[in-house]
């Protein structure tokens, strides 16, 4: 039986049915998933009860996997495989993280609008998130369509941002919430990297904004002007008409295209309810500036 596809929104989010991702995927089903992903950018696969190993195997169909940033900390006991980002609120013993736990405070940055791994010179192509335990109230994820947001920009704004390069750092987004607890290894790993503000997607040919709370400066622009422009673009891109809220069900698997979306996790009572979320992240094929044919020196 071929997979089924149900559009949740006309051109942004779709639900994929009649497939068990814990089993080998046929070439025709994989091709259909990839075609749907190019069109929609966010795909929802309900009722996926597979193992972490099957999760990672599915993700590898889309490219090489990233390693969790928590691997940088020798004092951090990882709960999951190093290729799996642990973005819930549980410690290594599956207990709820204390309110003052470093990992919890770090994870609060995920409630800002962001794009996964835009703080890496080679950023993410896509993220594939599995919901193992879901709070009964809150904790949904909002997604913003940066392709549609780009299309809706005034033409003079499109011309204004063409060729502009922002500097992204994980420390920038965390500092917005007052989190600065990084060791020297992390500070070196999270030095700012250049990313274009607008990019063309090679598979569809569409233009998209490329934004995240990790971005704090724009090359060749005063800090205040850069922050104002980044806020203006983010406010534009997160208007209701560009945003879809996914309300999680246990064992939902959601994958999204990090090249042309932003997302944020919404509040929930993280001292009362467990939220076990496991993400595989696939690397992009090249740095964004390189993909846009721009030679950008390190600063």
Can you annotate each of these PLM segments?
Residues 3-255, 259-299:
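Fe(II)/2-oxoglutarate oxygenase catalytic core
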